[in-house]
Amino acid sequence: MPKVEIYKSILLEKIGKNLTNYELESIIETAKAEICEIDIVNDKIKIEFNDTNRPDLWSSAGLARHIKTYLSGNVPSFDFFSMTDNLQKFYGEIFVSPEVFGIRPFIFGFLAKGMICDERMLEILIQLQEKLSHNYGQKRKRVAMGMYSSNLINFPINYVTCSSDYKFVPLGMDIEMSIKEINEKHPKGIEYSPIFENVDQYSLLLDYKNNVLSYPPIINSRDIGTLKVGDTNLFIEVTGTDLEATLLSLSIVACDLYDMGFKILPVKTVFPKETLFGKEIICPYYFQNSLKINVDSVNKLLGSNFTANDMCLDLKKLGISAYFEESDTFYIMPPVYRNDFLHEVDVIEEVMIGKGLDNFKSELPKDFTIGKLSPIEEFSRSVRNLMIGMGFQEMIYNYLGSKVDFIEKMNIKGSELLSVSNPMTESYEYIRGSIISDLLKSESISSNFPYPHKIFEIGKVALKDLVSDEGTVTYDNLAFLMADKEFSFNEINSLVSSLFYYLNIGFKVKESSKNLYIDGRGADILVNDIVLGSFGEVSPYILSNFGIMVPCCVLEININGLLH
C-alpha cells in the first residue's frame, strides 16, 4: 500500500487549523489511512494508506484538502478545468504524431506560475511524481509524470517518435547518449525501458525549436528537464496508455499545485484522431460522469433512516457535490481529482464515512450459523496444493480487463465474453472468459527472470449463457503456463497426466481445433465424454501479440466439472 512522508507544519498550514496528533490520527482515518511515525525533529509524518483508489491523497496538499473539506463541509472549487460545454482559454499546445499514438498514445499538460520553488516544495513535487508514476501509474507503464521549467520551452510542443539511434543529453549525465544507450546504461533506462519491449520506435517530446524535453516515460533531458530551487514557472505533462488515468493524474497534480499557491494555465493537446473526449482536449479537463443514487438503497445497506438532504451534506464533507430534486433520489458529481465511483455502493461508503463510523451502533447477529468450506473450495485447495507441489507459483489476477488483452491479443471474436456497459476505464471493460490471457500477460513482463517459468491461477471466469435466466454462467477454472525453450507438448502432456493421476480422475484427449495452439500441438480434455478444458503449445502468433519470445505451454480446465 502507498506510504508517503509529509511535512507536518505544511499540512497544518494548508488545513488552517492547529490539530493535535490525536486529532490528526482520528481524522486521517477518514482517508483510509493511518499515521505510522511522527518525526518531531525533521517535522515529518509518515502515513500509510490502506486503499490504492485515492491517489489524490498521496501528497500534503491532497491530504490537507481532504481534511479541510471534512472539517468545513465546503466543497473545494477549481475554475481552470475545461468541460465539454465550457472550454477554457489555453496557453500552449501539444501536437501528437500518428506514429506515437500507436506506442504511448496519450499526453496532457498545463502551465503553473506564480510561486518560487524552494527545497521543500521540490521535495513535495518529486514525491508526488514518484507516487503517481510508480503506484497509480504501475511503474510508469500506465501513467508517468514529467516536470520542466517552462521558461526554457518554446511552444508548441511536439510528441513524436524516434529511432534507437537518436541522441540527447539525459538528466544525470554530461554526455549525449542514444536511446539505445539510455535503455542499456542509464539507471532509469535499465529500470523502465522494458515498457518499450519489442518496438523499433520510441516516444520523444520536443519543443518548437526541436529541443528535447524528455524521452517519456523514461528520462528527462538535462537541459530542459531539470527543476531547480528558484524556478517559478513550471510545465507539467503526463503521458500514459490509459486515457482516463492520464487525465486524472494531471488533474490531481493541477489541484495540488493550485492549493500550493500556483496559478494554473491550461494547455491544449491535439491528437491525430478522435479520442473518447474528442480530437482536441484542453487540460485540466473534467471528464467524470454524474451518478444517480437511490435513498432507499443507501438506508437499506447502512441500516439507517437518513434523508436525501442528510446524505448530500455528508457527501460534501468528502468534497463530493451532491443535490436532490426528489426525496427518494439524489445526484452526485465526483470531484475533479477523483474517479473511483464505479457503483452506487461506492457512494454509500462515502455517506458512511461522511456521517462518521461512531454514529453507527453495533448490533449482534440475529442468527447463529456454523460456517464451512464449500465442496468446490475444498476441491480447489486440493488442486492448488498439487500445483504448488509440482513446482508452480500461484498468481492472482483481476477478473476485469481490456478488449486488447482478452480479445485482440488472444485472436478470438469475443462474442461469448461479457462487457461492462459503462466502464470507467478501458482497462476494465470486459469480464474475463479465460485465465490464459492473464498468464500470458504476466509472462510477457517476466523475460528478465531465470527460466523455466511455471505459474498458475485458480479463479473465476464468466461467459454468456442464453439458456440460463441470468444470461450468464460463471465457472471456477484452473489454468497454468509453462515457459522455457525446452518445453513442448510432451512435457505438458506428462504433467496433465500426473495431475489427473493424483486427483484420481480418468480422462481422454482429442485434438483441439482452437487457434490458441499450434496445429497438431493442442488437445481437448474429456471427462465422461464431456469437454472440460484443453492444453497445448501456444501459437507463435499469439505469443508475438504479447511480446513473448520463449515457447509456452498452457492448460485451462473447468474444475466445477472435475468435481461433479
UniProtKB/Swiss-Prot annotation:
Cofactor(s), names only, from the UniProt record: Mg(2+)
Enzyme Commission number(s): 6.1.1.20
Catalysis: reaction(s): tRNA(Phe) + L-phenylalanine + ATP = L-phenylalanyl-tRNA(Phe) + AMP + diphosphate + H(+)
Keyword Protein biosynthesis: yes
Subcellular location: Cytoplasm
Predominant location: cytoplasm
Similarity field: Belongs to the phenylalanyl-tRNA synthetase beta subunit family. Type 2 subfamily.
PANTHER family in the cross-refs: PHENYLALANINE--TRNA LIGASE BETA SUBUNIT, PHENYLALANYL-TRNA SYNTHETASE BETA CHAIN AND LEUCINE-RICH REPEAT-CONTAINING PROTEIN 47
Protein name: Phenylalanine--tRNA ligase beta subunit
Organism annotation: Borrelia duttonii (strain Ly)
